[in-house]
């Protein structure tokens, strides 16, 4: 049963009438451009064919009812006429409440809604299940009430909800690609202007995501430390963000910076340049160059930004040994575990899967999870 059929069926059973709309918003994987988003830089993600799906209908009052199919059909109810505060027991409900609350601040011309939510974006894997949920909820209200909001505004609303209501720091990339993704394309995003450019993906190339299943423990504290180090670097150059510093300016005075901060800054500057070049390489179908850029990105994350772990490095090495210069592989996401992403000719996928199955667990004691994805369409009706 598809997520659409599942949520529609549950909706009718729970609420006693049929849903009028079914909305989806996808998860994402970032092909290159890591930790550049909060430095006003460039990222190159694609939406993937794992998504949050919501069957929904407008109500003729001011109440919101939300059922979470993936959490034992837990039900949350709240009113649009009372202050929206955090739910004491259901963390999932706070993503929904946060999106609705921040949407009220932007455009309060919507009424009540019934929703049933289900999703298959792996949680805790760094594939943006939370952004997918935020964008899906925003799109539900936009579609049901014909709100004059575009994808970028729905994305910004989701980011605000996550930062201010849920209380998690995040950049804008995850919500933006979920809202604006394009089938068979990656999206080059300028995280300062929020300008986007669709970049066609070469035919016959699979987007493979492998979860190391190494439990990320440091990611929150270390993420905040990296942000502070980048801000320290920007202040040193008297610029609003590292986006505004050139590699030449950096090289001239790198010795004056704290050595750790210098390494962090170098990663951001080189990663920004790599990301812009990667978009060109992909567009030209130059998988060899894309692979080189992904390898440089991984080395920079490992050595300069210091956010990889041995398990992730091992996974990258196993994949690289199989694909050689026929594709690319690197860690993706915040770091300290999580996933790697690989662009692989479709005919090599079985060999990669076999090599990883034979070697990764033997070397690390952890079993990986392997996903073969298609670059997919952003949020909308399904």
UniProtKB/Swiss-Prot annotation:
GO terms for molecular function: ATP binding; galactokinase activity; magnesium ion binding. Keywords: ATP-binding, Carbohydrate metabolism, Cytoplasm, Galactose metabolism, Kinase, Magnesium, Metal-binding, Nucleotide-binding, Transferase. Mg(2+) binds at residues 130, 162. The record marks 28 as: Transition state stabilizer. ATP binds at residues 124-130. It catalyses: alpha-D-galactose + ATP = alpha-D-galactose 1-phosphate + ADP + H(+). Substrate binds at residues 34-37, 223. Its main location: cytoplasm. Belongs to the GHMP kinase family. GalK subfamily. This is Galactokinase. It comes from Escherichia fergusonii (strain ATCC 35469 / DSM 13698 / CCUG 18766 / IAM 14443 / JCM 21226 / LMG 7866 / NBRC 102419 / NCTC 12128 / CDC 0568-73). The lineage of its organism: Bacteria, Pseudomonadati, Pseudomonadota, Gammaproteobacteria, Enterobacterales.
